Every structure is written in structure tokens, then in C-alpha cells.
Amino acid sequence: MISNKTKGIAKEIRDRFKADGISNRNISVVCRESKYDGRKVETIYVIVIIPNEALDAYAKPIVEEYSKRYTCDILNFMFLSSYLANKM
């Protein structure tokens, strides 16, 4: 069972992207629980589709901010350019 702390972090991240004007269909935030070396590990996967020209300027500061603020087990960000996403 995913902890309330991890769920709260995931919701905050989703709300941050929505506040920045990224539509709901371009954001995916998923929490998963697994076992690693006999202990429970919670992972948050964040996938965001944004315009290609905004990748460097937008993505890097957000990843740095959340990596410093939270010490959850694993926090994965994946930013896809809208050009690449349309080709998939």
C-alpha cells in the first residue's frame, strides 16, 4: 500500500504541472510499490509531454527542485517532446 506521504508528493507534482498550464492529458503521475533487498520501496514515475523548445529551460529546474525537496525512495521524471510523442 502506497503511503499517504508518497501520494501527497505525487499530487503536488501533478498540481504543479497543471498550474503551469500543461493539460491533464499530457501529464501522467504513477506511484508503485515494490520490494528491494527485503524492504518496501515506493517509486513515483512522472511523465510529461511538453513542447520541444521548452525541454531544457522547463524540465531541468523542476527536476532539480523536486530532487532536493523530497527524499522518497525513487522519483523518476521523464519529459517527452510533443514532437516525439506525436510520432509514437
Regions found by a protein language model. Give the residues of each.
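Amphipathic, interaction-prone secondary-structure segments
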Residues: 14-55
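C-terminal basic regulatory modules in eukaryotic proteins
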Residues: 48-88
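A short, highly charged nucleic-acid-interacting micro-segment common to nuclease
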Residues: 1-11
